[in-house]
Amino acid sequence: MAKKVKKNEEITKKFGDERRKALDDALKNIEKDFGKGAVMRLGERAEQKVQVMSSGSLALDIALGAGGYPKGRIIEIYGPESSGKTTVALHAVAQAQKEGGIAAFIDAEHALDPAYAAALGVNIDELLLSQPDSGEQGLEIAGKLIDSGAVDLVVVDSVAALVPRAEIDGDIGDNHVGLQARMMSQAMRKLSASINKTKTIAIFINQLREKVGVMFGNPETTPGGRALKFYASVRLDVRGTTQIKGTGDQKDSSIGKETKIKVVKNKVAPPFKVAEVEIMYGEGISRTGELIKIASDLDIIQKAGAWFSYNGEKIGQGSENAKRYLADHPELFDEIDHKVRVKFGLLEDTEESAAADTVAAKADELVLELDDAIEIED
């Protein structure tokens, strides 16, 4: 019985060695034909962690889980009219430029306001802008920019405005069933691999439509078929909630609106988290406002009555004064922002890392000293 088991083990080992050799040969041929890295073992990947770029909003970075938009992925931002979709996308453009990257904006709606974009921090002199005549042209331009590998972010505003050429050439009232869905499906198949290879972030802004005759469930849907829903790694639902009233002379005027951004799909972190931000008219997302709210909840900024203080120093009476103080002191803003990101695990604590490095260095020194002492005794 023991001899039979041993023989079976030898046969298994022999065939196992042959299979491994065959696999190694196949991998070598694949690398020769398609380049190094075409096939690899998951554990051999140099970068396991998904690379991200900040969305330009602290609250949204936290809701996204990974600390921002994942690079090399497709993002869909949708919501009702005037909810802040383009504002959210323009903050991403400003952030990409801030990090030294190149951004492109495919303005299919022909409605981009350069002055508003500049107010949000976008360098309009460096922004690549295209206003295509048809959906195919817009997607082809986006594809060529992505294939170049030189663009870090491409925004398409919006999918609903990507009108197929056949529909433009036809008459109003002609039936063009499924044209846009087929166009988007083909575009997603072509673009997805290139987006991943070049690590470009592709943001598609989309509108909402109502399904006719829906009695139960959510009647809302997005144009362009289902392809974008499947290919998107992140989908954001942007909804404006309540108006923000001004103070003093503007107490009867609306100066902004509170907005909820729900992460309805997320392939890189847990989904269904919500970011609550203030979108101020002419300014965009109030970064100081969201920082004060989040830092106060974490007790990084202390609140006593109407006063806000940090490290025992008062920074303002009322949220508006505290916002102005942080806006006037960017170094303090960055310090508090860093502490919040460390608290949520979006960044490593540099002080703790430095302390750990010091401890490790001292441990290495002790090991060397012990080795030297042992050698002397010998």
From Swiss-Prot:
The keyword GTP-binding does not apply. This is Protein RecA. Gene3D superfamilies: P-loop containing nucleotide triphosphate hydrolases. CDD domains: RecA. It is found in: Cytoplasm. Transmembrane segments: none annotated. Belongs to the RecA family. It comes from Streptococcus equi subsp. equi (strain 4047). GO terms for cellular component: cytosol. Its main location: cytoplasm. It comes from the Bacteria.
